[in-house]
């Protein structure tokens, strides 16, 4: 890169849905010669994960208010003010050309601090419905981007940056054509409210028998209980694991996936080109429902709300899908994916830095 090295500050905290897309954009711009630092919180996943990617991280002290008591609500303005001041000092020391907000509690104080320091803010909303922080930050952002249509009325739809190994998977027609035998069902539980999946899928396995084979990620600490449930159902032959390290390999193996519909999961399922049964987490603003809806509308997935997610409903749905149907759904999933999301977000960061 000619001239002075451009500097980016990425704001992303709390969950993989915020942090992993931020890392994808960071690595893309670092490969172009950019210097990148991270703004996060010291007690969440980014604190250990981001340095593993060769990126220095700064911390501010901030947490969410949802579900907190009255005292936390009353002291919130003071804590937010302090977090903004912390972020301002970090911005002044680092002097970024642009700040990229990818979500999490850190984005509110960080985005305001950037604006107060005269640094352009590019905002990316991962979910199909915008959270409170991003709705507020959109008023001061230089550019607002969204992964799914509908979060903001006039924002560009750029998708969610996903891992390169998922993007590199063969297309559905190559991967799925000619497959025989039981339908391969990938079950992704683990983080947010996976108990319903862990309770229901052993019963589905018992109902469908040799029609399906499962690879089931159950999440931390749940392996003994779920393994026992499969054994009691007479279905001990399925692969039941606590965590899947290589999700690209799991997607490549699968014919269909059963999972929650967090923003990054939905984007990965589309990029992989997989049919899905989505079970949205029961959040009051129905964020995960809106994430999954574009794939259902495209004929690539079915949404089953948690109260209706029973062994009977899931078994009936899986039994109704033959391999030709699954291939058609897989191709529709891939058709609505945005495989160059990382490049699109990075391009907006570059554009914002030039107009600063």
UniProtKB/Swiss-Prot annotation:
Membrane topology: Peripheral membrane protein
Family note: Belongs to the glycosyltransferase 28 family. MurG subfamily.
Catalyses which reaction(s): di-trans,octa-cis-undecaprenyl diphospho-N-acetyl-alpha-D-muramoyl-L-alanyl-D-glutamyl-meso-2,6-diaminopimeloyl-D-alanyl-D-alanine + UDP-N-acetyl-alpha-D-glucosamine = di-trans,octa-cis-undecaprenyl diphospho-[N-acetyl-alpha-D-glucosaminyl-(1->4)]-N-acetyl-alpha-D-muramoyl-L-alanyl-D-glutamyl-meso-2,6-diaminopimeloyl-D-alanyl-D-alanine + UDP + H(+)
InterPro entries named in the record: GlcNAc_MurG, Glyco_trans_28_C, GlycoTrans_28_N
Keyword Cell division: yes
SUPFAM superfamilies linked to this entry: UDP-Glycosyltransferase/glycogen phosphorylase (SSF53756)
Record EC number: 2.4.1.227
Gene: murG
Pfam families: Glyco_tran_28_C (PF04101), Glyco_transf_28 (PF03033)
Keyword Cell wall biogenesis/degradation: yes
GO cellular component, one term: plasma membrane
Entry protein name: UDP-N-acetylglucosamine--N-acetylmuramyl-(pentapeptide) pyrophosphoryl-undecaprenol N-acetylglucosamine transferase
Native organism taxonomy: Bacteria, Pseudomonadati, Pseudomonadota, Gammaproteobacteria, Enterobacterales
């Amino acid at each position: 890169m000619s001239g002075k090295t451009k500097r980016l500050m990425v704001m992303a905290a709390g969950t993989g849905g915020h942090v992993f897309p931020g890392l994808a954009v960071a690595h893309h711009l670092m490969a172009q010669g950019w210097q990148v630092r991270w703004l996060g919180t010291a007690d969440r996943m980014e604190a250990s994960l981001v340095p593993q990617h060769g990126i220095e991280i700064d911390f501010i002290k901030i947490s969410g208010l949802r579900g907190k008591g009255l005292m936390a609500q009353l002291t919130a303005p003071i804590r937010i003010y302090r977090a903004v001041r912390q972020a301002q000092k970090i911005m002044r020391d680092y002097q970024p050309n642009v700040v990229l907000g990818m979500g999490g509690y850190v984005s509110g104080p960080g985005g305001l601090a950037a604006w107060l320091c005269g640094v352009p803010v590019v905002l990316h909303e991962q979910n199909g419905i915008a959270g409170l922080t991003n709705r507020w930050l959109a008023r001061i952002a230089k550019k607002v981007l969204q992964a799914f249509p509908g979060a903001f009325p006039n924002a560009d739809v750029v998708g969610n940056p996903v891992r390169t190994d998922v993007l590199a998977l063969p297309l559905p027609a190559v991967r799925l054509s000619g497959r025989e035998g039981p339908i391969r069902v990938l079950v992704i539980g683990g983080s947010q409210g996976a108990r319903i999946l862990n309770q229901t899928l052993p019963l589905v396995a018992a109902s469908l028998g040799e029609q399906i084979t499962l690879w089931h990620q159950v999440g931390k600490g749940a392996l003994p209980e779920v393994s026992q449930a499969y054994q009691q159902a007479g279905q001990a032959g399925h692969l039941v694991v606590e965590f899947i390290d290589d999700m690209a390999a799991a997607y490549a193996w699968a014919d269909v996936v059963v999972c929650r519909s967090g923003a990054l999961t939905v984007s990965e399922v589309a990029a992989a080109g997989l049919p899905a049964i989505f079970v949205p987490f029961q959040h009051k603003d129905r964020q995960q429902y809106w994430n999954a809806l574009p794939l259902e509308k495209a004929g690539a997935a079915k949404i089953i709300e948690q109260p209706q997610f029973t062994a009977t409903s899931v078994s009936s749905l899986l039994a109704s899908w033959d391999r030709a149907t699954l291939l058609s759904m897989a191709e529709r999933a891939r058709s609505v994916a945005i495989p160059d999301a990382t490049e699109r977000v990075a391009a907006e960061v570059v554009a914002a830095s030039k107009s600063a």
